[in-house]
């Protein structure tokens, strides 16, 4: 059963790509966890040991306690206590948020 998830934000390049910004494992109910597990198994593109690369289709709203710059993370940001707030079934993947928006949160804090 997959229960730990990695989330990305879009870069602002001409050809946007996802860059990892958070890992979370809490926030979904049991039914959502089972549904997401089935989706992951059906939509795996590559396997890296226990980790998987997936089709870019799902959007989740992520909450966190704090955000700050980080030289250790590829995205350039780190979030404190990330958690899943909700599964955004109403949004296509290309409407997920951008790294630029997250950087603005750091600048405006």
Model-derived features: where do they sit?
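Classical nucleotidyltransferase
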Residues: 1-109
């Amino acid at each position: 059963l997959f229960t730990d998830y990695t989330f990305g934000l879009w870069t602002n390049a001409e050809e946007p790509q996802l860059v990892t910004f958070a890992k979370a494992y809490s926030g979904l109910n049991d039914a959502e966890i089972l549904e997401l597990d089935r989706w992951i198994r059906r939509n795996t593109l590559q396997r890296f040991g226990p980790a998987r690369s997936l089709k870019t289709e799902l959007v989740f709203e992520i909450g966190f306690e704090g955000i700050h710059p980080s030289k250790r993370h590829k995205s350039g940001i780190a979030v404190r206590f990330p958690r899943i707030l909700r599964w955004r079934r109403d949004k296509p993947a290309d409407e997920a948020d951008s790294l630029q928006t997250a950087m603005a949160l750091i600048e405006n804090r």
